[in-house]
Every structure is written in structure tokens, then in C-alpha cells.
Design a protein with these regions (language model features):
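N-terminal basic/disordered segments at the start of proteins
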Residues: 2-40
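Short coil/turn connectors at secondary-structure junctions
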Residues: 6-10, 31-34, 52-53, 73-76, ...
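General beta-strand structural signal in soluble alpha/beta enzymes
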Residues: 13-15, 37-38, 78-81, 111, ...
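Short glycine-rich anion-binding loops that position phosphate/pyrophosphate groups of nucleotides
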Residues: 17, 83-86, 184, 217-218
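Conserved mixed alpha/beta catalytic, RNA-binding, or beta-rich assembly cores of soluble enzyme
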Residues: 28, 42, 128-234
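Conserved alpha/beta cores of soluble small-molecule-handling proteins
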Residues: 33, 38, 48, 58-92, ...
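Feature captures the catalytic cores and cofactor-binding loops of soluble hydro-lyases/lyases
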Residues: 40-75, 92-101, 196-293
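Hydrophobic alpha-helical segments and helix pairs
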Residues: 94-150
Length: 293
């Protein structure tokens, strides 16, 4: 951490949905840091009231209010944690004048462009967004097999194939997850999220074994939209008869990491974290594969 990041004062948390904000609060508190929380009304869990000592609610479009509250709290550096559903970002918000002006100026209307622009506005206001995994490094896996079982030859071939597909769709800001069977792409994530993508793949594959690959974006900005795997994903994989999961090492958060790996081991699911610069080459041999129409 830099000198600024080792300070216990001036910390804020911009909270979306899910467990991510709670984990950041716990991680920061373990280092003696008490965060002021700006919680998004449309997304953040009401239970944050019990977890945060200083909490303020704002709507998705209230950028000016959020900045004013952070100034009042003395926030100079902040973590953005928790999902904001992609379909809400441009369709469900009522922007204040500052956000409306920002939206009008965007060259492309996508999530990365918007949040990147918000980060620049915050920076101009003296509030620096930092790596959202800063307080959760034990939950970010290094390269290697995380479960008792390593992917077998079939799964390794599907992982190699899936990495190529996933890299392509993530570079186009379509999604970050693909589901593969016998080196055929069964499902590609869009706005529905990883778990729904796996469920859809199960319906399409009709019992064929599946492999799930989830990657980061090229040049992943660790301040926001970091890939996350949680217990519900492993549960969904189990239901879908998915037998292996590959994620990016150093760029993925595994919520409830110990329990997640135990659950995967119990289900016979192999999990491998792969260094983006050292991806395995796709095997040359062919296999029958699933028919694609």
C-alpha cells in the first residue's frame, strides 16, 4: 500500500448490492479503518445499517449528493464495492445535473465508460477511487489449482478453448463468462450475470458435462467491476452438472473462499486460477463436440 492507503482516516465506501460491501467493511475494520458508507438505495442491502457506523443513502442518479456527503465525512479515498445491475445503469436512473452532464459527454454508453468518468469526477473533487480488492487480498487467488482435484484432459481442453472465447467477449464489453462443452460454446454471458448464464447453459446442454470460464477484462481496472465468484455460483454449477471452473489469477474475488472450495470439493468440481499471461494453449486434437445450429 502507498502512504495514503495505510492511513486509517478519510476512507469511504460506495456500496452496491451483494456481500462485497460487507466484506470490504470487515476487511477495513480489521486494519483499524472505519469507513463512511455511501449506499445506493436501489441496490445496497438494508442490513448495512447494522454494519456501518456512518452511513448515508443516495439514489443512483444523485452524484452531487454523494460527493457532498463524502466531503462532509472527510473522505479522500474510497472503495467502490457491490454490483449495480447493468440494465439499471442507463435505464433506471434519474440523473442530477452533474451526472446528466457527464452522461451527455460520454463517447460510448457502457458501464466501463460511465464508471471511469465518475472516477475522474471524484478525483477532481479530491476523492481517489482505489483498488476494490485492497482489503480483501486473501480472497484473490494466485495461479494454480485451488481444489483437491485438478481439471482432467477434457476439462483442460474446454478451459483452453473457453479462455479464447471469453477474452473476445470481454474485450467487446459483452460479458466475462462462457460455458463450454466439448470445445463448443454453449452460453455467453450478457447482462444476466454468471449464475443465470450457467443455468441457461444447463437447459441447452441437456445433461452434457459443462465447464465454466470467467475472465477479467483486458486491462482490468481493479477499482470496479472485478470478477466475483461466490457460493451461489458453485451451487448453480452443481445443479448444471458443470465439472470445472477457470478464473483469472490475481484478478478475481472468491467470496467465502474456504467454504467455496469445500463446496466445490464435495461436488467434485475442479477450480483453477490461471495467470492471464500464461494461459494454456488449446490442445490440437479434436473431439466430437456438441452440435451448433
Amino acid at each position: 500500500m502507498s502512504n495514503a492507503e495505510t492511513s486509517t482516516a478519510g476512507w469511504g465506501l460506495i456500496a452496491g448490492n451483494g456481500r462485497f460491501p460487507f466484506l470490504v467493511l470487515e476487511g477495513a475494520r480489521s486494519q483499524g479503518i472505519e469507513m463512511a458508507v455511501i449506499a445506493l438505495k436501489e441496490e445496497a442491502a438494508p442490513e448495512l445499517v447494522r454494519s456501518a457506523k456512518r452511513l448515508h443513502w443516495v439514489s443512483l442518479g444523485e452524484l452531487s449528493k454523494a460527493i457532498d456527503l463524502m466531503h462532509q465525512e472527510g473522505v479522500t479515498q474510497a472503495v467502490m464495492a457491490g454490483q449495480v445491475k447493468h440494465n439499471k445503469i442507463f435505464s433506471a436512473i434519474r440523473p442530477d445535473w452533474k451526472l446528466a452532464k457527464l452522461l451527455f459527454s460520454l463517447p460510448r454508453k457502457n458501464t466501463d465508460t460511465l464508471i471511469g468518468a465518475v472516477a475522474r469526477v471524484l478525483e477532481d473533487e479530491g476523492i481517489r477511487l482505489v483498488d476494490s480488492t485492497l482489503f480483501l487480498k486473501p480472497l484473490v487467488p494466485e495461479a494454480g489449482v485451488l481444489t483437491r482435484r485438478a481439471p482432467d484432459a477434457r476439462e483442460a481442453a474446454d478451459i483452453a478453448y473457453g479462455l479464447g472465447v471469453a477474452r473476445q467477449i470481454s474485450s467487446m464489453d459483452i460479458g466475462q463468462t462462457v460455458v463450454i462443452s466439448d470445445r463448443a460454446c454453449v452460453a455467453v454471458e450478457a447482462m444476466e450475470g454468471t449464475d443465470e448464464t450457467v443455468a441457461r447453459a444447463a437447459r441447452i446442454a441437456s445433461g452434457k458435462p459443462l465447464v465454466v470460464v470467467k475472465v477479467s477484462k483486458p486491462g482490468q481496472d481493479m477499482r470496479f467491476d472485478v470478477p466475483v465468484i461466490g457460493l451461489p455460483t458453485i451451487e448453480q454449477m452443481k445443479k448444471a452438472q458443470a465439472t470445472a471452473l477457470a478464473v483469472d489469477a490475481g484478478r478475481t474475488l472468491l467470496f467465502d473462499r474456504t467454504k467455496l472450495i469445500e463446496l466445490a470439493d464435495a461436488a467434485g468440481i475442479a477450480i483453477q486460477a490461471i495467470a492471464p499471461a500464461a494461459e494454456p494453449a488449446e490442445p490440437k486434437e479434436t473431439s466430437a463436440g456438441m452440435n451448433r445450429e
